[in-house]
């Protein structure tokens, strides 16, 4: 018996991916696998627009609420866990519906991507350089040992620069040698991208941001501080949470925190759009389509008829 082929619903934030994934899973007999890095965290609900259990229509969801805010989310750990989930769903005869917009997490799941081992002592040494000398010094060192990697990573992205230096030192090879191999998606996954008109999407982001603050984002952050949010590495950097933490620290007023959350989200959406639009395997649909699920299913049917898996 042939296993069901997964469907991935990807694209920018606030386009309507979650609702489409629910519709597809409901119609096709599927289970959902989250691919939003910040929705991995327990208690980070309002600021990540995580669906409440009552909104999930009784459909099983995987890779939600699997980390404490003190734990570090990593692409490598996610890949291992999500691959098990997708293959387990397919083995049960259900359709895995993968949904989210965290770019590297999407790539790790759908493409062949082997992650080099880590070395805590090597990483700690480079993290110390980052802390003591700043991101410019780390970027300059990467430029010396691996110019191609230095050119491909934002000079302000300290975490990725440190990781690149760690990989180069451990493997003795350029960082690009561990890059994903783009080709046929893993499991022959059908990839659907959801997007909207830019002005419309900006309005949706503005509304979503306002509602997050009205519905208790500040109280959510305060509660998470009590369980270690400030001690985390990745969780406190999430858009919305970082801005509320800065407000609590007196860096600016609450209106400014909300505005910065909107601007940060809009900027992130532009990055997502640029990233996903480069992937020619994605079949794009308009999130404003009133018959979006029907259109998507039709698109998937046409894909199969064209001979794609």
Swiss-Prot record:
Keywords assigned by UniProt, alphabetized? ATP-binding, Magnesium, Nucleotide-binding, Transferase, tRNA processing
Under the heading HAMAP family, the entry gives: IPP_trans
Q: What molecular functions are annotated in GO for this chain?
A: ATP binding; tRNA dimethylallyltransferase activity
Concerning its family, UniProt says: Belongs to the IPP transferase family.
Q: Which principal EC class is assigned to this enzyme? A: transferase
**Does Magnesium count among this protein's keywords?**
yes
Q: Where is this site: Interaction with substrate tRNA?
A: 102, 123
What is an annotated GO biological process for this record, any one? tRNA modification
What this chain does, per the entry, is described as: Catalyzes the transfer of a dimethylallyl group onto the adenine at position 37 in tRNAs that read codons beginning with uridine, leading to the formation of N6-(dimethylallyl)adenosine (i(6)A).
This protein's name: tRNA dimethylallyltransferase
UniProt: substrate binding residues: 13-18
Query: How is the subunit organization of this protein annotated in UniProt?
Result: Monomer.
What is the phylogenetic placement of the source species in the record? Bacteria, Bacillati, Actinomycetota, Actinomycetes, Mycobacteriales
- Which reaction is this enzyme known to catalyze? adenosine(37) in tRNA + dimethylallyl diphosphate = N(6)-dimethylallyladenosine(37) in tRNA + diphosphate
Look up keyword Magnesium and say if it applies: yes
Q: Where does ATP bind?
A: 11-18
